[in-house]
Amino acid sequence: MPITTTAQVPPEVRTYFDRLLLTLARPYFIYDMFAQRRTIPLNSGDQMIFRRYATLNAATVPIQDGTTPPGDSLAVTDFSTQIKWYGNFVVITDQVQFTVQDRVLNESTRVLSLQLGLTLDTLIRNMMVATASSISCQFGGNGDTPTQITTEDIKTAVRALRLGNARLMTKPIPGENRFATSPVRSSYWGFMDVTIQNDLEACADFLSAANYPNPMDVLEAEWGSTNNVRWLLSTNGANSGTSNLGAPIWQNIILGQESFGVVKLGSKEAEFIVKPLGSAGTADPLNQRGSVGYKYPFATRLLNDNWITRLLSTQFF
């Protein structure tokens, strides 16, 4: 079947819809905000290898006069990932008049753009919840296993990340002489579904983002902080399995610096593809069908399980 790409669309139309695609897709990239970003040059294959050198133990043995110490050896760990292509399309009937002002074409682009954002967000989320590091909440009072999330559970997760040498991701926000505000600690970032935001707010040390000393320090989707975690809430949170009482188990992600990476191919953004009415030739003899679609090359990879953890919880409030 003949495929009509953007090369067959007038330049002014291509420019408009490409911008629309990027503008609508990016705000939904919540989970990729703190990724290590890498690019594979075009025509250089489709696999990326992240490499990390192991640290050396402290050299506490004094050097003896005239004696060469045994020395040490370097150890490296490689993490590989492969670019894969993702995409989708919708069919448009002959009611569409192919102009840049056309409402159906515009709305099709809008819907596909939102799907692209959700797709990338979900791919990264699924990669995160695949980490081998997990902690079940146990200090809540809902009588389930795991329990709802509490301050003590969050402290347990923070302690585990600290013991794994995960670096904190934000600097402290110092207090200011403003009514009802409080300072914010240096923090890891946490991801949580909005379904259990009431449980988060019920934590003993929860500080709403509205009560940060400076609202300019608040990220989009940031709900507040507890202990050494600042929380971003999304309707695209993850749950898997059921608890002892049959409730969904929510996967609350807490991470430090350089815990995961994302890879793109060259300078390519999402490719926006329009097939005008009749582009199928004899397969569409009456010019009744066209389509709008996108495709995007992408890969994501966990880089250190000690620097990311899942805090498993159920819902109480």
Predicted regions and their residues:
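Sequence/fold signature of self-assembling virion shell proteins
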Residues: 2-34, 144-171, 187-191, 195-317
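Short acidic, glycine/tyrosine-flanked loop/strand segments centered on an H-E-D-like triad
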Residues: 73-100, 266
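Beta-strand elements of well-folded, non-transmembrane domains
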Residues: 54, 94, 296-300
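Surface-exposed ligand/attachment interfaces on beta-rich extracellular proteins
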Residues: 36, 142-147, 178-181
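A generic local secondary-structure boundary/capping motif
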Residues: 38-39, 176-181, 219-221, 281
